[in-house]
């Protein structure tokens, strides 16, 4: 709050200010943070150091992330939907994190290898196959059953369309998710060594759902639902 929210009025301004602070001061580790107002939602991913990328969330799709970078695409010319460190691509190219002449990569509209933010600035490790991928896979299966993905591979769509409008009840269910009634349900099977990390875990200190009802006055239109502790016990 002290370094961002008190200085901004919109979600876009919030993402832009935090990005400038990252450029100026740097950061020790990657993270993601969302900003919401009554018109837009922006989500910023930090790539450690002084690099960052922020995307405006599509209004007809949802976004799920674990403890890992999820963004892929970046179109510098699309100022309406993207903001980033000004040298995001150039730095990656200069330091061998991105090769615009990669013959095997998907091409952009200029005929160059498409820039992939996750590939350039993040990584996929063995731990992700049990700690991060399953949560993204599980919630996308919950909201979009038609999506067929291998839970062991990071090929999940960044944004996805839900099979139906997502309600507050759906979000509460999502925050309580622990691979319910499957072989990976650690609570059902009393398996303290279950490898898949659930969304709902005992070390959760707070669970938040933020709702913006733009047709109502600010005083009653913006609501935060908070559960103190793991979602499944709320």
Predicted regions and their residues:
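Glycine-rich loops and low-complexity Gly/Arg-rich segments
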Residues: 2, 6, 58-61, 68-70, ...
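Generic alpha-helical structural element
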Residues: 3, 7, 55-56, 160-164, ...
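Short capping loops/turns at secondary-structure boundaries
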Residues: 7, 11, 24-28, 43-47
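Active-site-adjacent helix/loop patches that line small-molecule binding or acyl-intermediate pockets
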Residues: 33
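A cross-kingdom feature marking charged/low-complexity
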Residues: 36, 40-74
């Amino acid at each position: 709050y002290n370094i961002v929210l008190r200085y901004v009025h919109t979600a876009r301004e919030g993402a832009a200010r935090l990005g400038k602070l990252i450029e100026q001061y740097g950061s020790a580790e990657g993270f993601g943070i969302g900003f919401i107002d009554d018109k837009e939602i922006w989500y910023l991913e930090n790539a450690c150091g002084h690099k960052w990328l922020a995307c405006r969330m599509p209004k007809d799709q949802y976004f799920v992330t674990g403890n890992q970078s999820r963004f892929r695409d970046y179109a510098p010319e699309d100022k309406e939907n993207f903001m980033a460190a000004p040298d995001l691509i150039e730095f990656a190219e200069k330091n061998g994190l991105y090769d615009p002449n990669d013959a095997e990569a998907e091409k952009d509209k200029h005929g160059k290898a498409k820039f992939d933010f996750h590939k350039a600035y993040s990584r996929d490790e063995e731990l992700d196959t049990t700690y991060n991928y399953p949560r993204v896979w599980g919630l996308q299966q919950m909201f979009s059953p038609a999506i067929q993905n291998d839970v062991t591979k990071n090929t999940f769509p960044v944004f996805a369309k839900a099979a139906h409008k997502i309600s507050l009840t759906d979000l509460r269910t999502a925050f309580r998710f622990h691979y319910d009634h499957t072989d990976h349900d650690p609570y059902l099977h009393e398996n303290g060594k279950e490898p898949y990390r659930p969304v709902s875990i005992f070390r959760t200190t707070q669970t938040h759902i933020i709702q913006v009802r733009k047709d109502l006055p600010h005083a009653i239109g913006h609501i935060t639902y908070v559960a103190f502790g793991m979602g499944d016990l709320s």
